[in-house]
Amino acid sequence: MDGGLCFDSWSDYLGLSSLISRGLQPRGEGENPSPRWNVSCPAPAEPLPSKEPEGRGYKGCGFCRSNKEAMSLYSSHRLRSLDGRVLCPVLRGYTCPLCGANGDWAHTMRYCPLRQLLRNPQSPRNGQ
């Protein structure tokens, strides 16, 4: 069989391994920890909490709760502020290995806007 005409499932055609490796490299001192790509963050994955955190239905931080943290921890804070910034101290300390986001705009790989763009590229069709 012709080696040049076959699809090799083990080949990294898009160069994603080097992209991820660059995202996993430690940053130097004084280097800005902001994302390396110009990707705007989408709306929060979870609905924003009401202004009254103790209101009916409030269950605390969804991130900590889903990671099975103690109730005393997850009920002590909200995941996001009303303007969408991350409040959870655990998530704020996490850095996305794909885009480098952390702090106010921290997210896990599952909610990374870069991952979502790679999964659903919105390229123009038929030259439009």
UniProtKB/Swiss-Prot annotation:
Motif C2HC 1: chain residues: 61-88
Zinc finger extent (Nanos-type): 60-114
Single GO cellular component term: germ plasm
Region of interest: Disordered: 23-56
Motif stretch (C2HC 2): 96-112
Region (Essential for its translational repressor activity): 7-23
Binding site for Zn(2+) 2: 96, 99, 107, 112
Disulfide bonding pattern of the chain: none
UniProt KW Metal-binding keyword: yes
Subcellular location, record wording: Cytoplasm; Cytoplasm, Perinuclear region
GO MF term list: RNA binding; translation repressor activity; zinc ion binding
UniProtKB keywords: Cytoplasm, Metal-binding, Repressor, RNA-binding, Translation regulation, Zinc, Zinc-finger
Written domain comment of the UniProt record: The Nanos-type zinc finger is composed of two C2HC motifs, each motif binding one molecule of zinc. It is essential for the translation repression activity of the protein.
Record text on subunit structure and interactions: Interacts with ccnb1.
Protein family (similarity comment): Belongs to the nanos family.
Protein name as catalogued: Nanos homolog 1
